[in-house]
A protein has these predicted regions:
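Structural preference for beta-strand elements that scaffold enzyme active sites
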Residues: 39-43, 76-79, 114-116, 134-135, ...
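Glycine/serine-rich anion-binding loops at beta->alpha junctions
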Residues: 48-57, 75-82, 203, 209
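A generic "binding-loop/recognition-motif" signal
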Residues: 47, 120-121
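Short helix-capping segments at alpha-helix termini
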Residues: 108-113, 197-200, 238-239
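N-terminal amphipathic alpha-helix/helix-capping segment at the start of soluble metabolic enzymes
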Residues: 1-48, 196, 290
Length: 295
């Protein structure tokens, strides 16, 4: 059971990190003041394999409609993916991905909605940027140098995801042997240096809590790990860049109330000072964040 005493101990051990500030910047003409106002990123899934059925759109029209609804509900950015990160999901080739992504990107950008594209493919990244994408949500390290250069050339922001593997579809076991934060800090420091050398100025860091590692299939182990990282987010902010979290569903615990899971995890992520919330439940997360501001 999570207790107040544990939160107090965490803060006492890392008091200096609690006051860390991160870079603020504009994306596509929109200013993000992360230190005073967290942002929300809504999700549109173009893959039929995606687990969160409410976010799945199987046509361009449905995807554009959902993107516009998310923006109207308060999403600052709409994140689009054409290949599920689920371990059993089908692989989707570059041409098939771009065939789905590009029409949606173009229509949402025409509506002045900021668009992020989740990918680990340089070819998909290039096509998405040329179509007007504002953010690359990178779920792999292979080819990252190329994609960083592409992002810099288009003045796009980059979300660097922590991945223990070549990409999100090729991961094994997550190292749970010790405190994960120093390991993530080292990984992000290396990737930040590579990105900055490539000319990327707008960087966001994502611990990758939604990825399917083999040894995190046990629900209690996985959720305990996720909760721990959410609450320790402020320690990663010492790197000087905003932190993004993809909010999980924890169906094993929430069952028929699974749509309440992301709001629950949003509370923990907010306590940890998360800067960007990636969610399938935009209005619920907006309500949580607005309510927490009242205190």
């Amino acid at each position: 059971m999570l207790k107040l005493e544990q939160l107090a101990e965490l803060l006492e051990k890392n008091s200096a990190a609690a006051s860390a500030r991160v870079r603020e910047f504009s994306i596509g003409g929109k200013r993000f003041n992360f230190n005073s106002q967290p942002a929300v990123m809504g999700v549109v899934n173009l893959s039929p394999d995606s687990w969160y059925r409410e976010s799945v759109c199987l046509s361009t029209e449905a995807a554009v409609r959902r993107g516009k609804v998310l923006a109207a509900q308060g999403a600052d950015i709409v994140d689009i993916g054409a290949e599920s990160t689920l371990a059993h999901a089908a692989r989707v080739g570059g041409p098939a991905q771009t065939g789905k992504l590009l029409p949606v990107i173009k229509e949402l950008r025409a509506a002045r909605i900021l668009v992020s594209v989740e990918t680990y493919s340089p070819k998909v990244a290039r096509a998405a940027l040329e179509a007007g994408a504002n953010v690359l949500n990178l779920t792999g390290t292979a080819g990252s140098r190329k994609m960083f250069k592409m992002a810099a050339a288009h003045d796009a922001a980059v979300i660097i995801c922590f991945v223990q593997g070549k990409n999100v579809r090729e991961v094994g076991n997550f190292d749970l042997s010790a405190d994960s934060i120093p390991m993530m800090r080292d990984y992000f420091s290396r990737q930040i240096e590579i990105a900055q050398r490539a000319g990327v100025e707008k960087i966001i860091l994502d611990p990758g809590l939604g990825f399917y590692y083999r040894n995190l299939q046990d629900s209690a182990v996985r959720v305990r790990h996720q909760m721990n990282i959410f609450l320790n987010t402020f320690r990663l902010r010492e790197l000087g860049f905003p932190i993004c979290h993809a909010l999980p569903h924890a169906f094993e615990f929430f069952g028929e109330e699974v749509r309440c899971a992301e709001p629950f995890f949003a509370v923990l992520a907010a306590l940890g000072k998360t800067d960007l919330f990636r969610t399938h439940e935009v209005p619920r997360i907006k309500a949580v964040l607005e309510t927490m501001k009242v205190f």
